[in-house]
Amino acid sequence: MTPKLIIHGGASSLDDKGGLATVRQSLHQIVAAVYETLTAGGSAMDAVVQGCELLENEPRFNAGTGSVLQSDGQVRMSASLMDGDRQNFSGVINVSRIKNPIQMAQFLQGQTDRILSDYGAADLAREMQLPIYDPATDFRIQEWMEERGEDVRKKMARLIADPTVGIEARKGTIGVVALDANGKIAAGTSTGGKGLERIGRVSDSAMPAGNYATRFAGVSCTGVGEDIINECLAAKVVIRVKDGQNLAQAMAKSITEALENNTDLGAIALDHQGHIAWGKTCPVLLAAYHTGTAIGDTLELTDGDHYGNASILKLQKTVKKIQTKTRGK
């Protein structure tokens, strides 16, 4: 079977990440590196962990290095991993002072207690002898200081001028869904949270609402965590595929429902037949994928492109090229 892969770097603006070309280069490089693992015989789980690590190590994304700071100025990260073949979920919630939370989720796959938070996650990090690491970047520290230093009047003026200001960090997450040569699926999601949140807040990234996989399909979500939890988006899409809908139908129905509820979210997905799909209610979805023959992405979708798949996007690009050539004549 031809392996398939899709990754995302969140649902936030391209502008604060270096622009279209920079983000595209970063995502495409990671997709290419992870796909090599799959073509070399690596498992879906191997690919997902590798992809999450690479995305966590990229400071422009809100996971691992470059995670946003909470209200007290500390970084607390969450991550989960799901083996679709075994339908086995594991994760850590609000873990600090490590580099790659996905590694802890991977370790927990083989444990009886597979979801740990706060003090339990800290104990596990020591048990695993993970090096102490500060994931906060100068950019995130400065961002936190500016947000904390603003008085209410200034903050309101900024929000009126640009309604997206102040909410972009809430939509930062990274995720990977992979299908290997044996037809097995895995999904992983990691986040630094929404920024300035109350201490103890739990995101969707370490829940089946935000990350879920079975032998039928796998989904990773991004966006406002509370919206994703309310929709139970990842599990909803996967269950619909299991119940007989194809992946495109399952994603379209789930995103249509999310639009009706005025949510702010996005999702990437794969199924056991190798179909690749995505959906979003947010303006931007920073996703890239490998079809087995080519790398593509969703970076230039419009606000009205709420759901789609690799085949449709390829067709749209072909039509666009033909139209451009026709105009040139």
UniProtKB/Swiss-Prot annotation:
Coiled-coil zones: none
Presence of the UniProt keyword Transmembrane in the record: no
Catalytic residue list: T173
Superkingdom assignment: Bacteria
Gene Ontology BP annotations: proteolysis
GO MF annotation: an example: beta-aspartyl-peptidase activity
Annotated binding of substrate, by residue: R201, V202, S203, D204, T222, G223, V224, G225
Enzyme class: hydrolase
Record-listed E.C. numbers: 3.4.19.5
Entry PTM: Cleaved into an alpha and beta chain by autocatalysis; this activates the enzyme. The N-terminal residue of the beta subunit is responsible for the nucleophile hydrolase activity.
Keywords of the record: Autocatalytic cleavage, Hydrolase, Protease
Marked site: Cleavage: G172, T173
Catalyses which reaction(s): Cleavage of a beta-linked Asp residue from the N-terminus of a polypeptide
CDD domains noted in UniProt: Asparaginase_2_like_3
Job of this protein: Degrades proteins damaged by L-isoaspartyl residue formation (also known as beta-Asp residues). Probably performs the final step in the degradation of the reserve polymer cyanophycin (depolymerizes the building block L-beta-Asp-Arg). Also has L-asparaginase activity.
UniProt subunit comment: Heterotetramer of two alpha and two beta chains arranged as a dimer of alpha/beta heterodimers.
Family assignment from sequence similarity: Belongs to the Ntn-hydrolase family.
Protein name, UniProt field: Isoaspartyl peptidase/L-asparaginase
Organism: Synechocystis sp. (strain ATCC 27184 / PCC 6803 / Kazusa)
